[in-house]
């Protein structure tokens, strides 16, 4: 049986549509749990292109790290991230899909939708 790898760092990034959810996750989850994380932007709700932030996050992911990507629907960042050879990004909508993709696909990047902004069940997916 393959043992789960130790995660030493979490990278998080979003476009403008995911900025509010990203800020919430950082403040209410990553910060409170004292996770070792790096915020790769964006830093406002000013319009930006999600592929740029997905690419930046993917370049940082290695065997001891994981990523969280957020855009309006989660679909765009998922497609962008999966263009990178070493990335297995999964769009998740609830705790069950997050758990199953981690277990069965060894996903190293979770993709979330920022619109509409919903706090419910977010932490169960992380």
What are these regions (language model features)?
Residues 69-115:
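Mid-chain, well-packed structural core segment of small domains
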Residues 36-47:
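A short beta-strand-loop structural module common to alpha/beta enzyme folds
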């Amino acid at each position: 049986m393959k043992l789960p790898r130790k995660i030493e760092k979490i990278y998080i990034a979003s476009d403008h549509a995911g900025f509010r959810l990203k800020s919430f996750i950082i403040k209410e989850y990553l910060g409170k749990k004292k996770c070792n994380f790096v915020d790769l932007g964006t830093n406002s709700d000013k319009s930006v292109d999600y592929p740029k932030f997905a690419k930046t996050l993917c370049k940082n992911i290695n065997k001891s790290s994981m990523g969280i990507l957020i855009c309006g629907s989660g679909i765009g960042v998922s497609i962008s991230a999966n263009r990178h050879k070493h990335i297995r990004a999964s769009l998740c909508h609830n705790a069950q899909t997050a758990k199953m993709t981690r277990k069965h696909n060894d996903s190293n990047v979770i993709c979330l939708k920022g619109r509409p902004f919903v706090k419910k069940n977010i932490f169960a997916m992380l």
